[in-house]
Structure formats: C-alpha cells, structure tokens
C-alpha cells in the first residue's frame, strides 16, 4: 500500500494545505457527482465536490414512504441513516465503482488519484490503497465484472486497467498507456468481459480500443460537443452516448455509425442510465429535467421530474425492472425518485406496445442548434408539463449542508469572512483553524465593512472554497511575508514591539505534533528571535485535514494534524516535507524583515527655501512615531530630543503623506498601502508643531 504519491523533488515547488471544518461532516456540502448502490446491504455511496465519500443505509423501495406521503430526509427517525465517511481524496470525487463481489469500492478524483476502499460490512478501516499513475484529473471509471477489471481514464490522455483479482491490497496495472490518444478523456464504458472499451476525447470522436491488445479499431463521429457519458450493452453491439450538445445517440458498433438520436433535452446531457435489457434510457443534465426514452425510438420521451439544479449523476436502484432512481445534482441534496409513482406519467401495462408509447410519451420536434434567447426548456416539454402533472416530490431525500461560496480576507490577514449557499455569514480564524463567530443571514459586504481596519498586513496564504469548506494553502513565496508586532497582532505580551510571523506560527501549529518539530521547539532558547516570532502559535483541532502537495496541487500525502506524531505518518512527512518548512520548524530559520526605502521632506507649509530630500531605508514595520523621533532629533537637531518621551513625540512633530496626517502608531507599509497608493518610493513630509 502507498499512502503518498511519488515524492520526487523534481518539478514544481511543494505547497501545504489544510481544511477548516467540523470534526464530523456527515452531509455533503456541494455538488454530488458520483453514486453507487450496494443492493445486498442496502447501502448508498455518494461522492462529490467536497472530497468526501459518504455511506448511507437506505430502505428498500417498498419500505420507503411514497411521494404522496411526503419527502423523508436523513435524520434520527428517518429511514435513511448516515453510516460513515471515506476520507482520503483532496479534490472533487468524479466517479466510483463497486467491485470485488461488493467488497471493494474504487473511486476517482480531480486530485489525480484512484483510491481503493474495503467496504465489507464490519470493516472499520476502509482505506486500502492509492493508485497514483495519472498526472491530471481522473475523469471517469468503468468496471468489467466478468473480468474483474477496473478501467480509469484521465485528462492526462492515459487509460489504465487494474486487476481486481490480483490482490485486494495491491492492484496490478495491465495497460500503462493508451497509445495515440492526443486529448483529455471525458467519458468511458466497457463490456462486462472487457472485450472492448469506448472512450471520448475532444474532436467529437468516440473511439474504441481493445484493452487486451491496445488496438483501436474504430472511430465514430456524430456529436458536436463533448460526450459526457457512455454506455455499452453486454454483448458490445450497441452503445449509448450523451453529450453537451444536448443529444443522446444510439450507435451500432458493427456498422460503426449513429443509428438514432434523441433531442428532447434543450441543454447538455451529462448523465445516462439504462436498464438491464437495454430497453429504456434515463437521462439528465443542465436543463434539470430527468427523462425516460425507449432505446429503440429515441424520438419519444417521457418527463419523469424536474430537479432544483442541473443533474450531475443518475443511478437506477435496480437494473432489472427499476423501481426508483437516485439523483445527484449541483446542489448538496441527494434524492430518490419513484419510477412507479401515481403522479408520474407511467407507461401503462404493455411497455413494448406501440399504443403505450403514443399514449404516454411525446415525440421530439426538430429544434435549431441554437435555441432562441430566453428559452430555458424545450417548448414541447413545457406543453407536456401543462398537459400532464409532473412528479414533483421524491420518495426519499438525503439533505445536504450549506456550502461556502463566497469569502473575503480581512485586512489583518488572519480572519476570513464567508457566506454560504443559504446566505449565512461566518468569521474564521486562520491561525486557530476554526470558525469563531456566526452572523446569521447578512450581506457579506456589510459585515466586511464593519470588521475592516486601517491596517496593512502582506498576504501570506491563499484561500479556496471549491469544496464548500475553507481550504488554506501556504507556499514558499508568500508564507513568511507577514511580520507584525505582538501589539498589532493582538497578543498579550509584555514587549509590545516583539515581532511575530504569522506564517511561521502557522507552520508550528500544523507540525506541533511532529517529533522533529517538538524536539526543535524544546531545544530552542526562549531568547531565540525565531522562537519569539512563532511562540504564540495555536494548537489546531486534531481532526484538521493537512495535505502536502506539488506546486500544481497534485497531492503527495494527506493526514490529520492529530496524527502527525504517529510512526507511519511521521515517516511519510519526513519524505515529502519541503525544505522551506524544515528550515523553519527544525532549524529555526526565518527570512529577515522586508526593508522599505522612503524620502523625508519638509512640509510645503514650512516654506523651506531649499528643502532637503533625505532618502532613508527601514523595516516596513517601522512605526511613524519612530520616524518622528528621527526627524526631531537628527533632521531638526533639537538638543532636548532625549527628554521627549516617544509616546509624546506627536506633540513636537507631525507627519503627512499625500496631505493626510498620519497617526504615530501606524507602520510604514500601512502608510504606503492606504495613503501613498503608488508603486514609487514613499514620500513623507514632516512639520514641527507650533506651541
């Protein structure tokens, strides 16, 4: 097993990331794009943009409340119960397959990895291995149950095949590279015996290849945009494709041609499912409608229901005579809709009869390739909606949690204000790694204005909220930029002028439990300047996910902050932690303060006949009162300079920048950022105070 990717020092520089979140995250926080159902144990596996795979215990269709009886959400008395989470991915979970006779779950992610999980009923340690062969987003997976092979495809243009039977703890790679593929791969399908696979990459080509020989015997054209989903029937003679061009196409593999096209959807079709007999296809996508069409006549369709958000993933509860369908969308809720509801436009008795199609299905009408502005759904669907009531209530719903979708970093470069999909505003402390205040439903801009201060601290971290949670990233270029005094940082310290470094403190917090860091901290003397600069660090919550990654974001190792002291995690960290981290936490090395050049001139109101322009240089954290003291003593040559306390120097000298009077406690970088506002060197004007 491998817990980390290749830790080679070559390539782009490494970064550190951590996620501020609750200890338990039982609900999805954004889009749900991957679904798998274990019918034997009535378990649903769900994954999406928040990086976490969740397991749910769900009732059989006959045990669920009907749509007529109302929606049942996950909760204490709900038939749907959260079971556990599988947490190792660091980016969007794109796909999942159940394999190994239901004992294994294989998942793919935008973090470039394929991960293997043991999901046996009583196994509490689900993670088995990380397969790190891809170098870009892993877009999709396919499973050949008769051959017990898993296939992965990626934006890196590679396709890999893994042997599930080889060993649960050590998947064997059968095909290293699909030669000749020149573009990212968006979709993938295989026959149950892996006799051949279909895949799509740009240039509107669906291509076939034989995984056993790596031969590519055919190409099929027809779609005018990316193909987002592919399905093959069991004998490999027919295929279905769904595209961003809004069409569903049926292909004859032997003839290598498109033999039927469905145009019911007005916008991109992102996901399709087909029953075991390859008789009916279920489709969903950007227009939010979920439709059912007979495969032998894609010109006919039936509207099943309309979702609240674009549909990312469909999953039939059963392949044989499906009674319900699971739906994941751009929202965090997951729903199961009945396919036998009294409110649904049912097929009636004879599903194969022509009369049932003409009675319960509508026929697609030709449409232009570019729909008229303002049309958000096909006109024929709108008319069908008017004629027949849509099913508007799912039989089950697993409610999601709100996701952070907006944020603002406060001027102190320590706190971040966030707003979520329900307009709740909250305040996070980056140094403490936790949420510190909730403001309820308010406008983010209004709270930001209330919390903003006239202080400038250089940026030292990057914020990302694509997972619906707050992710903080540190890199070598900026992490040590934020020097400030303990007074400005708000720390209770006897020496208010002691300098602290936020980035150094953050590294102490992240590695506090790592043995090399603990040893270095213990050996450093209290008078050590770096020790002083980082001594105010916070102890982070132990459940905080912590990731070492390459410069492009590809993960090298993921762990929890609280596990850094464990033997395995400690050893893996030692292999992948970059030098700029170890220099600080092991050797107590920090960059020096940044210097700032500036000019001193007498204020124009002094009517100086030949004003002298002095060019000076000082740390950017130098306070204006120190400049006042220099002017009073050195420039003006006052003999009583030593008798004027520093906290009273403003009674002798005034300082100006761009005609604005400066406060004595303001530092030079704040003056440059808020008052000077130019790229050139800072100009400061002094004027003696007249008694």
UniProtKB/Swiss-Prot annotation:
Output the superkingdom of the source species.
Eukaryota
InterPro entries, per database record = G-protein_beta_WD-40_rep (IPR020472), WD40/YVTN_repeat-like_dom_sf (IPR015943), WD40_repeat_CS (IPR019775), WD40_repeat_dom_sf (IPR036322), WD40_rpt (IPR001680), WDR48 (IPR051246), WDR48/Bun107 (IPR021772)
Q: Where are the WD repeats?
A: 27-82, 88-130, 133-168, 180-219, 222-261, 264-303, 306-347, 399-438
GO-annotated molecular function: ubiquitin binding
Give UniProt keywords alphabetically: Repeat, Ubl conjugation pathway, WD repeat
PROSITE patterns recorded? WD_REPEATS_1, WD_REPEATS_2, WD_REPEATS_REGION
Q: Which GO terms describe its biological process?
A: double-strand break repair via homologous recombination
The organism's lineage is: Eukaryota, Metazoa, Ecdysozoa, Nematoda, Chromadorea
Entry protein name: WD repeat-containing protein 48 homolog
What PANTHER family does this protein's entry cite? WD REPEAT-CONTAINING PROTEIN 48
């Amino acid at each position: 097993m491998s817990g980390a990717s290749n830790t080679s020092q070559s390539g782009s520089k490494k970064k550190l990331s951590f996620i501020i979140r609750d200890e338990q995250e039982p609900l999805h926080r954004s889009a749900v794009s991957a679904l798998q159902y274990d019918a034997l144990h009535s378990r649903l596996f769900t994954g999406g943009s928040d990086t976490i795979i969740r397991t749910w215990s769900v009732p059989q269709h006959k045990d669920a409340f009907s749509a007529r009886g109302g929606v049942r959400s996950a909760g204490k008395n709900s038939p749907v119960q959260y079971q556990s989470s599988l947490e190792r991915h660091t980016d969007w979970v794109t796909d999942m397959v159940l394999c190994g006779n239901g004992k294994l779950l294989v998942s793919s992610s935008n973090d470039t990895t394929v991960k293997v999980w043991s999901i046996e009923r009583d196994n509490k340690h689900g993670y088995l291995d990380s397969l790190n062969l891809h170098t870009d987003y892993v877009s999709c997976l396919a499973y050949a149950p008769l051959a017990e092979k898993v296939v992965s495809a990626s934006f890196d243009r590679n396709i890999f095949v893994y042997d599930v039977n080889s060993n649960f703890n050590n998947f064997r790679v059968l095909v290293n590279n699909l030669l000749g593929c020149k573009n990212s791969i968006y979709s993938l399908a295989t026959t149950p015996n892996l006799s051949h696979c279909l895949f799509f990459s740009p240039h509107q080509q669906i291509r076939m290849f034989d995984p056993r020989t790596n031969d590519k015997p055919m190409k099929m054209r027809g779609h005018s945009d990316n193909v987002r989903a592919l399905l093959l029937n069991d004998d490999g003679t027919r295929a279905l494709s769904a595209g961003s061009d809004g069409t569903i196409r049926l292909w004859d593999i032997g003839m290598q041609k498109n033999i039927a096209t469905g145009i019911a959807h007005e916008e991109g079709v992102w996901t399709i499912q087909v029953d075991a007999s390859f008789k009916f296809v279920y489709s969903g996508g950007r227009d939010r409608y979920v439709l059912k069409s007979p495969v032998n006549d894609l010109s006919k369709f039936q509207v099943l229901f309309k979702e609240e958000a674009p549909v990312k993933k469909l999953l039939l509860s059963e392949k044989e005579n499906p009674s319900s369908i699971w739906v994941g969308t751009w929202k965090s809720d997951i729903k199961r809709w009945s396919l036998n509801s009294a409110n649904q436009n049912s097929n009636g008795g004879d599903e194969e009869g022509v009369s049932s199609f003409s009675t319960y299905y509508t026929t697609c009408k030709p449409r232009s390739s570019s729909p008229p502005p303002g049309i958000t759904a096909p006109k024929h669907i709108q008319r069908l909606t008017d004629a027949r009531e849509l099913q508007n209530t799912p039989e089950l719903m697993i409610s999601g949690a709100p996701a952070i979708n907006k944020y603002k970093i406060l001027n102190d470069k320590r706190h971040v204000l966030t707003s979520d999909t329900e307009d709740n505003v909250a305040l996070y402390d980056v140094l403490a790694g936790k949420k510190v205040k909730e403001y309820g439903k308010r406008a983010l801009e209004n709270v930001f204005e209330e919390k903003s201060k006239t202080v400038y601290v250089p940026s030292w971290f990057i914020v990302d909220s694509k997972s619906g949670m707050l992710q903080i990233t540190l890199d070598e270029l900026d992490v040590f930029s934020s020097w400030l005094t303990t007074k400005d940082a708000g720390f209770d310290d006897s020496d208010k002028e002691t300098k602290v470094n936020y980035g150094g403190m953050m590294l102490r917090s992240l590695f506090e439990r790592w043995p090399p860091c603990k040893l270095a901290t213990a050996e450093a003397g209290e008078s050590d300047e770096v020790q002083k600069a980082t001594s105010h660090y916070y102890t982070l919550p132990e459940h905080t996910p912590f990731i070492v990654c390459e410069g492009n974001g590809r993960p090298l190792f993921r762990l929890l902050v609280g596990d850094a002291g464990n033997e395995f995690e400690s050893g893996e960290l030692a292999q992948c932690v970059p030098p700029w981290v170890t220099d600080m936490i092991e050797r107590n090395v920090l960059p020096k303060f940044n210097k700032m050049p500036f000019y001193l001139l007498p204020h124009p109101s002094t009517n100086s006949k030949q004003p002298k322009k002095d060019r000076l240089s000082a740390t950017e954290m130098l306070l204006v009162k120190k400049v006042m003291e220099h002017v009073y003593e050195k420039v003006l040559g006052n003999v009583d300079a030593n008798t004027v306390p520093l906290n009273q120097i403003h009674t002798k000298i005034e300082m100006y920048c761009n005609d604005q009077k400066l406060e004595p406690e303001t530092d030079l970088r704040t003056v440059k950022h808020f008052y000077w506002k130019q790229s050139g060197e800072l100009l400061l004007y002094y004027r003696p105070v007249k008694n």
